[in-house]
Amino acid sequence: MDNHSSVPWASAASVTCLSLDAKCHSSSSSSSSKSAASSISAIPQEETQTMRHIAHTQRCLSRLTSLVALLLIVLPMVFSPAHSCGPGRGLGRHRARNLYPLVLKQTIPNLSEYTNSASGPLEGVIRRDSPKFKDLVPNYNRDILFRDEEGTGADRLMSKRCKEKLNVLAYSVMNEWPGIRLLVTESWDEDYHHGQESLHYEGRAVTIATSDRDQSKYGMLARLAVEAGFDWVSYVSRRHIYCSVKSDSSISSHVHGCFTPESTALLESGVRKPLGELSIGDRVLSMTANGQAVYSEVILFMDRNLEQMQNFVQLHTDGGAVLTVTPAHLVSVWQPESQKLTFVFADRIEEKNQVLVRDVETGELRPQRVVKVGSVRSKGVVAPLTREGTIVVNSVAASCYAVINSQSLAHWGLAPMRLLSTLEAWLPAKEQLHSSPKVVSSAQQQNGIHWYANALYKVKDYVLPQSWRHD
């Protein structure tokens, strides 16, 4: 596991914030002495002191907000990835990779096209008079040839995600074979030339080849399609390659990673509590970097929406534990061969993989084998963040993070929020501020994605290579 304590800016940030706090105390004390010497106030001394503390708190929080914003900008620039952070090339460097062509009849992933771990379920045929027709976008990329046998331009219409992946693939094709372009023989189909269940009818599938029709290239073309980010690729025929993607709606909805509200966490008191009822400040069972069970404080909710419908992956272990989590969420996986603990996206965990599960008798986390991987659609999403960056849900150890395949990078990215939580606990006016009956817990106020988590999600595409992201 990575060592989080060696972050170069962590100690400097702590010293800076402590200096701010000390300066605020000094300023408050000086102001208090001058006020007492110059005049006699009619306000009771206790109430005056409370008002001073509140004013001092607001000044400190204002400066702290500026510091957090600075850290958010500086973090991607100072981070240097560790070797154990998972697959992918380092930032700013190109690493040559050997790409192996697919063989005839091979599909990636080796699952049904309509599973959540592949392109996902069908959502319904889109016709020209359908409300969803406006969601299809034309592709006028000059590096792509469209056969367009119908002469209606239908082959240029596709979902936004399909267009994005197709454009990436077109660039890869030109790099692999100079002078050759990508050929699209079929995209959105309005004439029902395919089977009853086809993603062509939704603009989520394309049939492709190379412009020179050289069938010896098709195996590598399929591999390039996988690398471009298509969610399901099939070398189904010697004459073409078939590719499809997830729906735009499933991608845009809660990609950050969440659990179901009905899933439970174990409190330090020994009581199991549904995640939908957790509050900031609750201490729940978590996991240290070396796989030891520990209780950790909930400091915020990265996402919380009890009404949102969402697709989840379900992991069943041979010990009877069931974890329900979104596909892009990181789950702890034990590697028995190397005796190492890693974190893997939930939709990439396979049967026979081992996850860490709490032992009822000893309270320790022990490996259990995954015997079934399924999917379910459920209502509500909750993503608590603990100080440790991990949480044990339904007895299964999981990360608090998603989308990025490095637990350490994600944990460092949330360091400003942990720092903010720590400083709030040190502020002298905390008790006065929280004693007001009008104050509502953050968990009750929040409905949606936390602003900081959303900011990190938006900048990830600019600072991280694609191989590090769940796509």
Curated annotation (Swiss-Prot):
It is found in: Nucleus; Cytoplasm. GO terms for biological process: analia development; anterior head segmentation; anterior/posterior lineage restriction, imaginal disc; Bolwig's organ morphogenesis; cell fate specification; cell-cell signaling; compartment pattern specification; compound eye morphogenesis. Ca(2+) 1 binds at E149, E150, D155, T185, E186. A lipid is attached at G257 (Cholesterol glycine ester). Ca(2+) 2 binds at E150, E186, D189, D191. A lipid is attached at C85 (N-palmitoyl cysteine). Changing C85S: N-product is made but fails to undergo palmitoylation. Keywords: Autocatalytic cleavage, Calcium, Cell membrane, Cytoplasm, Developmental protein, Hydrolase, Lipoprotein, Membrane, Metal-binding, Morphogen, Nucleus, Palmitate, Protease, Segmentation polarity protein, Signal, Transferase. The record marks D303 as: Involved in cholesterol transfer. Its EC number is 3.1.-.-. One of its GO terms (cellular component) is cytosol. SMART domains: HintC (SM00305), HintN (SM00306). The record marks G257, C258 as: Cleavage. In embryos, expression starts at stage 5 as a few stripes at the anterior and posterior ends, this expands to 17 stripes during stages 8-11. Expression is also seen in CNS and some PNS cells until stage 13-14, and in foregut, hindgut and salivary glands. In larvae, expression is seen in the posterior compartment of the wing, leg and antennal imaginal disks. In adults, high level of expression in specific regions of the proventriculus and hindgut, with slightly lower levels of expression in the posterior midgut. Relatively low levels of expression in the anterior midgut region. InterPro entries: Hedgehog, Hedgehog_Hint, Hedgehog_sig/DD-Pept_Zn-bd_sf, Hedgehog_Signaling, Hedgehog_signalling_dom, Hint_dom_C, Hint_dom_N, Hint_dom_sf. GO terms for molecular function: calcium ion binding; cholesterol-protein transferase activity; morphogen activity; patched binding; peptidase activity. It is an enzyme of class 3 (hydrolase). The record marks H329 as: Essential for auto-cleavage. The record marks T326 as: Involved in auto-cleavage. Induction: Strongly up-regulated in the anterior midgut and the posterior midgut in response to bacterial uracil. Interacts with shf. Interacts with ptc and CG5504/l(2)tid. Belongs to the hedgehog family. This is Protein hedgehog. It comes from Drosophila melanogaster.
